[in-house]
Amino acid sequence: CHPDQFNVLASLGQAQVEKTIKELNHHGWLMDMLGAHRDYRCPINIHVNNAKGDPAEIADRFMMNLYKCDESVRSRLVVENEDKGIWTPSLLAKHFTIPITYDNLHHKCLPDGLTEDQAYRLCYRTWHRKGYFKPLFHYSESHPDKSNPRSHADMPTEIPIDGGYSFPVDYDIELKWKDDAIRAIETCPKN
């Protein structure tokens, strides 16, 4: 599950943090009602969404506020690399002990000196810090007809990387024509 970007656990504003905790607790409750596992097999994925200040202080504030959330959230919450700001895979891995959802388009928009393969591997390893969990990664491509590289394409032109390593990963396909895009990826010949 991927709650909206207005959720900012690292906010300096207490009202925003309280709204975020309430929203995340609702997602955790709903996942419990659906019978979802209370671990990283059923992640709740959010962005840090705060680039103002020292990364260590931001991460500490994020984690302190995460501990105010219900167990249904704490046991599932993961963070995602961002397409703007500061939160790249390397910085997330340095400051967070929870898994990182790798988003290939975000990495292209906000590279951190790591190749796509290196960023993929780094994020993959974070899912195994507390046991074995199959990572949930995001796949998308830039829209070819838009000037903003962050705009998501309608359909894929390639298939998500697996690094050639046969790493088991679940992908959330973040392309505009979701079902058609998934079918196109499933029928693509693999090299």
PLM segments and residue spans:
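Active-site acidic/histidine proton-transfer and metal-coordination neighborhood
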Residues: 1-99
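Active-site beta-loop-alpha junctions enriched in small/polar residues
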Residues: 4-6, 47-51, 80-84, 105-107, ...
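Short, surface-exposed, charge-dense and proline/glycine-enriched linear segments
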Residues: 28-37, 65-74, 106-115, 162-173
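A general structural signal for well-ordered alpha-helical packing
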Residues: 63, 89, 105, 117-120
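Conserved mid-sequence domains
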Residues: 97-107
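Histidine-acidic metal/acid-base catalytic patches
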Residues: 98, 110-191
